[in-house]
From Swiss-Prot:
Protein name: Glutathione S-transferase A2
Residues that bear N6-succinyllysine: K4
Function: Conjugation of reduced glutathione to a wide number of exogenous and endogenous hydrophobic electrophiles.
UniProt cross-references to SUPFAM superfamilies, sorted A to Z: GST C-terminal domain-like, Thioredoxin-like
GST C-terminal domain sequence ranges: 85-208
Cytoplasm is among the record's keywords: yes
CDD domains linked: GST_C_Alpha, GST_N_Alpha
Reactions catalysed according to its record: RX + glutathione = an S-substituted glutathione + a halide anion + H(+)
Lineage of origin: Eukaryota, Metazoa, Chordata, Craniata, Vertebrata
Length: 223
């Protein structure tokens, strides 16, 4: 029997958090090997574990996978969270990419210079309420089903619900005018595996704070 997937990253959200969410939603237990020093990253690079010299990296099924989307797609395929045919996968990919676009803006917010932060937050709020949330709300309204694609849980639902939590951390009022998204969030959050992941003490990571940011900069030698 294969061992648990092993996740190599620093002890923070970053680009690994969506992978943690997807594994957790699939009910898959995983181990984490935290990169705590720059030398830990050097070792992974020097022993050939990182194809492109970067993390996240996930050891799964005898492979050392890098590149976030490749990792997510493998997990989604393995655990039947990637639709039933090519058309469904295309929709799942399209919705996931939209989630990623807004998620990137939120993820990079801690790196924003203080004098630009208010403008960046305003831009995120505008994109959230005028571009991304209306698009996803419309998908759910048009087909009247419980999930985004094929009336079945997919990685697109999980990525979107993860994003909804991040948006709520930024400003809880942004979700107020999107009842179907609120319904999706409640539905996915009540699934036993996700509910467990949302409890305190799980492998879910907290929002990036100043201390966490400085730690990441030190590990990855970011000036």
């Amino acid at each position: 029997m294969a061992g648990k997937p092993k996740l190599h990253y620093f002890n923070g959200r970053g680009r690994m958090e969506c992978i943690r969410w997807l594994l957790a939603a699939a009910g898959v237990e995983f181990e984490e090997k935290f990169i705590e020093q720059p030398e830990d990253l050097d070792k992974l690079r020097n022993d050939g574990s990182l194809m492109f010299q970067q993390v996240p990296m996930v050891e799964i099924d005898g492979m050392k996978l890098v590149q976030t989307r490749a990792i997510l797609n493998y997990i989604a395929t393995k655990y039947n969270l990637y639709g039933k045919d090519m058309k469904e996968r295309a929709l799942i990919d399209m919705y996931s990419e939209g989630v990623e676009d807004l998620g990137e803006m939120i993820m990079h917010l801690p790196l924003c210079p203080p004098d630009q932060k208010d403008a960046k937050i305003a831009q995120i709020k505008e994109r959230t309420t005028n571009r991304y949330f209306p698009a996803f709300e419309k998908v759910l309204k048009n087909h009247g089903q419980d999930y985004l694609v094929g009336n079945k849980l997919s990685k697109a639902d999980i990525h979107l619900v993860e994003l909804l939590y991040y948006v709520e951390e930024l400003d809880p009022s942004l979700l107020a005018n999107f009842p179907l998204l609120k319904g999706l969030k409640a539905r996915v959050s009540s699934l036993p595996a996700v509910k467990k992941f949302l409890q305190p003490g799980s492998q879910r990571k907290p929002p990036m704070d100043e201390k966490n940011l400085e730690e990441a900069k030190r590990i990855f030698r970011i000036k």
